[in-house]
């Protein structure tokens, strides 16, 4: 049993890293989308301010 423990922990750690990496990828894609949206929002706001 003690010899099996490190392997188990390694697997848990590996799965955790994989999930974390996927989560970072997801956040990055979301940030890119929001950046594009923010740029369009800024342009809209500038037009709106200019109109006022």
Swiss-Prot record:
It is found in: Mitochondrion membrane. One of its GO terms (biological process) is ATP biosynthetic process. Coiled coil: none annotated. Keywords: ATP synthesis, CF(0), Hydrogen ion transport, Ion transport, Membrane, Mitochondrion, Transmembrane, Transmembrane helix, Transport. GO terms for cellular component: mitochondrial membrane; proton-transporting ATP synthase complex. Mitochondrial membrane ATP synthase (F(1)F(0) ATP synthase or Complex V) produces ATP from ADP in the presence of a proton gradient across the membrane which is generated by electron transport complexes of the respiratory chain. F-type ATPases consist of two structural domains, F(1) - containing the extramembraneous catalytic core and F(0) - containing the membrane proton channel, linked together by a central stalk and a peripheral stalk. During catalysis, ATP synthesis in the catalytic domain of F(1) is coupled via a rotary mechanism of the central stalk subunits to proton translocation. This is ATP synthase protein 8.
